[in-house]
Amino acid sequence: MEGSSKGLRKGAWTAEEDSLLRQCIGKYGEGKWHQVPLRAGLNRCRKSCRLRWLNYLKPSIKRGKFSSDEVDLLLRLHKLLGNRWSLIAGRLPGRTANDVKNYWNTHLSKKHEPCCKTKIKRINIITPPNTPAQKVDIF
């Protein structure tokens, strides 16, 4: 079982590990992640290899600041989809779900959260005697 494996490296990746992973993916392609650590000669678990590739090393990943068009699209998609980062990232070419989530949390969440959530207030309606009180949601 992978979780009980001892001696697997954790923490920051080295440039050498990144290079080994790139070479392995270049030779064998993406997928079959359970074989990647052995093929690449890495002392990492398969999940760590997969996430490192998908979130940092994959050549199609965009680096740098989000453009104003990307920010605008992110705002509209978040209003529509909520915190479904994978779905949102799928509509922002070159951006990973992790990038999108981190950008939202560091740049946009505090500015745009109030407009995206409808506050519900519960109030008691005054009713005639001998009838149960009613609770109504007010938006």
Curated annotation (Swiss-Prot):
Domain of life assignment: Eukaryota
A biological process term (GO) from this entry: regulation of anthocyanin biosynthetic process
UniProt main location, coarse: nucleus
GO cellular component assignments: nucleus
SUPFAM superfamilies: Homeodomain-like
InterPro entries on file: Homeodomain-like_sf, Myb_dom, Myb_TF_plants, SANT/Myb
Single Gene Ontology MF annotation: DNA binding
Keywords: Activator, Developmental protein, DNA-binding, Nucleus, Repeat, Transcription, Transcription regulation
Alphabetical list of SMART domains matching this protein: SANT
Subcellular location: Nucleus
Residue spans binding DNA: 33-57, 85-108
UniProt keyword annotation of DNA repair present: no
Domain HTH myb-type: 5-61, 62-112
Quaternary structure and interacting proteins, as annotated: Interacts with BHLH002/EGL3/MYC146, BHLH012/MYC1 and BHLH042/TT8.
Job description of the protein: Transcription activator, when associated with BHLH002/EGL3/MYC146, BHLH012/MYC1, or BHLH042/TT8.
Protein name: Transcription factor MYB114
